Swiss-Prot record:
Disulfide bonds join 247-264, 392-398. This is Probable exopolygalacturonase X. PROSITE patterns: POLYGALACTURONASE (PS00502). The keyword Zinc does not apply. Gene3D superfamilies: Single-stranded right-handed beta-helix, Pectin lyase-like. GO terms for biological process: cell wall organization; pectin catabolic process. Specific in hydrolyzing the terminal glycosidic bond of polygalacturonic acid and oligogalacturonates. It is an enzyme of class 3 (hydrolase). PbH1 repeats lie at residues 231-252, 254-274, 285-306, 327-348, 362-394. The gene is pgaX.
Amino acid sequence: MKFSYSFVQVVSLLLSLSPSVEGFTRSRNDACKPNHPFRPLPPSQPRTKTCHVVSNGHGKDDSKNIMQALHKCNNGGKVVFDANKVYTVGTALDMTFLKHIDLEVLGKIQFTNDTDYWQAHSFKHGFQNATTFFQLGGQDVNVYGGGTFDGNGQVWYDLYAEDALILRPILFGIIGLKGGTIGPLKLRYSPQWYQLVANSSDVIFDGIDISGYSSSKNEAKNTDGWDTYRSDNIVIQNSVINNGDDCVSFKPNSTNIIVQNLHCNGSHGISVGSLGQYKGEVDIVQNVLVYNISMYNASDGARIKVWPGVSSAMSEDLQGGGGLGSVKNITYNQMYIENVDWAIEVTQCYGQKNLTLCNEHPSNLTISDIHFKNFRGTTSGKRDPDVGTIVCSSPNVCSDIHAENINVKSPKGTDEFVCTNVDKSLLDVNCA
């Protein structure tokens, strides 16, 4: 069931297309294939006027020109970033006022490498020290055109190697958007996560091309493709992701999410979590479908990661544990893997290396109604003889976890799973 070659061809074609009409007229619901959103997406109103953003050129800040065009064409217009032009952004842009507007990005939007400015002025979102170059929100907003957003990440990769506590901006911040289409677009060299989708609903991401590696010895770290947070009814599809962390991550209070037709390379898998990081807070992730995924050269394929009930530290800038909540109705269906460490990983000891301590203080989050189906491929062999791990910190917090038609082997031909504190009768895998 290796569909990667033809799949990449199809996605490449999709990424090469950009709308040429005066506004974004394609139905959001019709664009969602083969699986439709949990709730119908609202229609986009016609656009009747066009504004072209003026580029100052020579690396001069174009932020004022961008904001002027957005205000001029808000409520029924289209703002165009012209082809073969570079737009420089050196100012944090609050674009949460947008309504019934399209942004057609044909050229390149590049953010400056002034790390002192961005640490002081980027938008702070609280969760996991997330900050963004800009925040785009409002109602009925479409961003497309096949152009490029460039985060100038190299200076950040090198700076993070010196100081793990710096605040690295996220390239693309969707904050408080109600109804929208994002893509096709190219996202390059994000300092941290590529996209944060927070406090948003009814948004489809379609045809996103993500790539950006370090050119120095310092890796590009924490470069998640998408992180959904406090968001509902989101569709992510038809995209190619070359990165160094989660391909997609469902952060706290992500509900009714469809992820389909992705090619992920170099990632940490498609992950629920991490959840339960903040003591006393309630994290819920439910109603998620992940379908038709190709996963290459990754640490994980499908992943659920939950913090234990005791304080733990994943790294200097990532600590937590003791949170509450639930993970429910999550399905991973049809995943091809190649050179992936774990085909499936479920852990409630995220960030805690002392497993005895973790088991003494089991997670406060429950995991239930989980389905892993139709997996094919070969692991990296790093975990030989195991190819997957489904481990709960207590049988009292895990139930109804299913695995069926899992045809994954290591390079040596083994297919063992680590299965702890789960009902093995529901797992059609070789629990060692």
